[in-house]
């Protein structure tokens, strides 16, 4: 047993080190940037060290557990622990946040506050993925919202206040249901609240009550994931946010919803999940088609990419609803895969906006001639997004397909129907993704304009793009990198279900 508090250090380090930023000189933008990047790198190295030397892959139980009494009156503990399901998102968080701080290099206005908020988000995200206490999970979930709201409302585009208000209304509204579910589960059947994940997993509830809890949690995760029809905050938020914030939103924030769906709804409420799972699959299928057919109608480049995120999260929801080994593993792989691809697309959209100052696709055109590096990277990630074989998106979607087809829970006709509709969604994906590339990069519109000389991406931007591209290719060629983390845990979760 390892008694060193690794997880506490990993969760607390970014926000506590971030609070020291305010002691740095106000005008020292360079010092602030380097300090933030060093903190992020140190955190990423810590996570990697703990993963390599203190984490056993073949053990589906909770590892590196820490349990400290916090508030005695209602038995509230600082309880952390990781398993195969949470290690993937934690590594993804470390990786994407480090690159997002590097992407935020051009920001000079109020840079102390900006970098502090990014580090506060970092703590909230890792805390959510590693907490083993329902109330602690809720607190970490909420810790995420305030930094995002401020990052949106202070460093966003023209309609930033509208989109920030919409974001906070949606997510805070969803969090009310999360809090009600957490308190309901904690207080059920005893005078003393039991907020421990392990105790809650062994607790049995009346079916009606379990369905109510499940539905409450589902609303909270549906806002965050997002699941239609609670997705409308996402395109507005992505359309206005600075691209480094978009990287964190698309890469990590949306994954917290899918993670919560597996961690709480599947693990703690298995009966309700087997009732709701057909509906999840139907909604996921509608979501893929709806978002893929809405996306081509968007003029705003970032909104178009945001709708592609909604479409890709549909695969995760279908995988979670299939209740099979392959389906759930595919969903976990899609979470990681889309974390990389979504973050990269928003980063490249933002860097091209920095140069041409245009956000509407019908005003762009001909950028490829003057910016070949951005063109190459954007095209590569568009291919990854439309699930080109050899890239991570293809493997994830293929495994989800396999999960549906092998699911014994559903009859043959519904399975064929869902697979057919998903296939239509996969055909629509290249349509919006390739037309987006065509409108941006081909033609002569900007090339013929006066002062049409634009700078191509510099070493910093190339480094960020290539750093994200390598794992996308790596997972596409050898998906066991990610699957080996979660495969034992997925089996342990599915052992609660009658269907296998």
Curated annotation (Swiss-Prot):
InterPro entries, sorted: NADH_Q_OxRdtase_chain4, NADH_Q_OxRdtase_chainM/4, NADH_UbQ_OxRdtase, ND/Mrp_TM
EC number: 7.1.1.-
Recorded topology in the membrane: Multi-pass membrane protein
Pfam families (UniProt xref): Proton_antipo_M
Single GO term (MF): ubiquinone binding
Domain of life assignment: Eukaryota
Family: Belongs to the complex I subunit 4 family.
Catalytic reaction equation(s): a plastoquinone + NADH + (n+1) H(+)(in) = a plastoquinol + NAD(+) + n H(+)(out); a plastoquinone + NADPH + (n+1) H(+)(in) = a plastoquinol + NADP(+) + n H(+)(out)
Name of this protein: NAD(P)H-quinone oxidoreductase chain 4, chloroplastic
Transmembrane segments: 3-23, 37-57, 87-107, 113-130, 134-154, 167-187, 208-228, 242-262, 272-292, 305-325, 330-350, 386-406, 416-436, 462-482
Localization per Swiss-Prot or TrEMBL: Plastid, Chloroplast thylakoid membrane
Primary localization class, coarse: plastid
CC annotations in GO: chloroplast thylakoid membrane
Keyword line: Chloroplast, Membrane, NAD, NADP, Plastid, Plastoquinone, Quinone, Thylakoid, Translocase, Transmembrane, Transmembrane helix
One biological process term in Gene Ontology: ATP synthesis coupled electron transport
């Amino acid at each position: 047993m390892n008694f060193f508090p690794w997880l506490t250090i990993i969760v607390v380090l970014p926000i506590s080190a971030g609070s020291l930023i305010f002691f740095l000189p106000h005008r020292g933008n360079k010092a602030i940037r380097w300090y933030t990047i060093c903190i992020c790198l140190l955190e990423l190295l810590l996570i990697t060290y703990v993963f390599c030397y203190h984490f056993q892959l073949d053990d589906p139980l909770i590892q590196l557990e820490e349990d400290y009494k916090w508030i005695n009156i209602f038995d509230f503990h600082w309880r952390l622990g990781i398993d195969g399901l949470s290690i993937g998102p934690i590594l993804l968080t470390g990786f994407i946040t480090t690159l997002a701080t590097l992407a935020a290099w051009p920001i000079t206005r109020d840079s102390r506050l900006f970098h502090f908020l990014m580090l506060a988000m970092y703590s909230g995200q890792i805390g959510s993925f590693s907490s083993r206490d329902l109330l602690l999970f809720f607190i970490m979930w909420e810790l995420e919202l305030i930094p995002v709201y401020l990052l949106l409302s202070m460093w966003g585009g023209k309609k930033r206040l509208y989109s920030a208000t919409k974001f906070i209304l949606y997510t805070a509204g969803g969090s009310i249901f999360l809090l009600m579910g957490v308190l309901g589960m904690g207080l059920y059947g005893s005078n003393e609240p039991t907020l421990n994940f392990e105790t809650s997993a062994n607790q049995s509830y009346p079916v009606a009550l379990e369905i109510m809890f499940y539905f409450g949690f589902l609303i909270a995760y549906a806002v965050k994931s997002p699941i239609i029809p609670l997705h409308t905050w996402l395109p507005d938020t992505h359309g206005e946010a600075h691209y480094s914030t978009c990287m964190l939103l698309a890469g990590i924030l949306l994954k917290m919803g899918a993670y919560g769906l597996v961690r709480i709804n599947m693990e703690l409420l298995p009966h309700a999940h087997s009732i709701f799972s057909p509906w999840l699959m139907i909604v996921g299928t509608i979501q893929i088609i709806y978002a893929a057919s809405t996306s081509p109608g968007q003029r705003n480049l970032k909104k178009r990419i945001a709708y592609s995120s909604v479409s890709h999260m549909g695969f995760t929801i279908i995988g979670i609803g299939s209740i099979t080994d392959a389906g759930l593993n595919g969903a976990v792989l899609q979470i990681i895969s889309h974390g990389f691809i979504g973050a990269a697309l928003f980063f490249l959209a933002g860097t091209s906006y920095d140069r041409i100052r245009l956000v509407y696709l019908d005003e762009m055109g001909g950028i490829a001639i003057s910016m070949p590096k951005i063109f190459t990277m954007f095209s590569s990630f568009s291919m990854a997004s439309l699930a080109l074989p050899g890239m991570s998106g293809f493997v994830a979607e293929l495994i989800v397909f396999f999960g549906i087809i092998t699911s014994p829970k559903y009859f043959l006709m519904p399975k064929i129907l869902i697979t057919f509709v998903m296939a239509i969604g996969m055909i629509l994906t290249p349509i919006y993704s390739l037309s987006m590339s065509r409108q941006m990069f081909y033609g002569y519109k900007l090339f013929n304009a006066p002062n049409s000389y634009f700078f191509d991406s510099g070493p910093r931007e190339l480094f960020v793009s290539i750093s994200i591209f390598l794992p996308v290719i790596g997972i596409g060629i050898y998906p066991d990198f990610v699957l080996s983390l979660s495969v034992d845990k997925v089996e342990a979760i599915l052992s609660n279900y009658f269907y296998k």
